């Protein structure tokens, strides 16, 4: 007999550094999940990623208190800020530009995001990432990466 799903929990958890403190502990604890078991499994699955990178995670909680989880790719805005070498986006992206990113860097990010995004091809995904870059105040430079 198949397990019945009790709930879905969506969290952004830092890669390789999951611990029982908020927001993980309270979110999982109220559903009756073994928090340390999740933290160990998550850290094992994300140990090949850069520590501290926020990873969107969807946790499926079953009625017998077991769980499974899916990790997604980091948000495009995080990847863009990392590629541009900035820590935060512009508060007025149309007026103040805070960094520059090349088209090659956008294509590299599109390749990473291709796994999760529903865009039919790399061009559509790149356009979406360009929109995100504009919304955080980045200038798109022509040319290749360094």
UniProtKB/Swiss-Prot annotation:
Keyword Ribonucleoprotein annotated: yes
Subunit structure: Part of the ribosomal stalk of the 50S ribosomal subunit. Interacts with L10 and the large rRNA to form the base of the stalk. L10 forms an elongated spine to which L12 dimers bind in a sequential fashion forming a multimeric L10(L12)X complex.
Gene Ontology terms, MF aspect: large ribosomal subunit rRNA binding; structural constituent of ribosome
NCBIfam families: L11_bact (TIGR01632)
InterPro entries linked to this entry: Ribosomal_uL11, Ribosomal_uL11_bac-typ, Ribosomal_uL11_C, Ribosomal_uL11_C_sf, Ribosomal_uL11_CS, Ribosomal_uL11_N, Ribosomal_uL11_N_sf
GO biological process: translation
Biological role: Forms part of the ribosomal stalk which helps the ribosome interact with GTP-bound translation factors.
Family: Belongs to the universal ribosomal protein uL11 family.
Statement: the UniProt record of this protein carries the keyword Cytoplasm: no
Post-translational modification: One or more lysine residues are methylated.
Protein's recorded name: Large ribosomal subunit protein uL11
Pfam families: Ribosomal_L11, Ribosomal_L11_N
GO cellular component: cytosolic large ribosomal subunit
UniProtKB keywords: Methylation, Ribonucleoprotein, Ribosomal protein, RNA-binding, rRNA-binding
Native source organism of the sequence: Buchnera aphidicola subsp. Baizongia pistaciae (strain Bp)
SUPFAM superfamilies xref list: Ribosomal L11/L12e N-terminal domain, Ribosomal protein L11, C-terminal domain
Superkingdom, taxonomy of origin: Bacteria
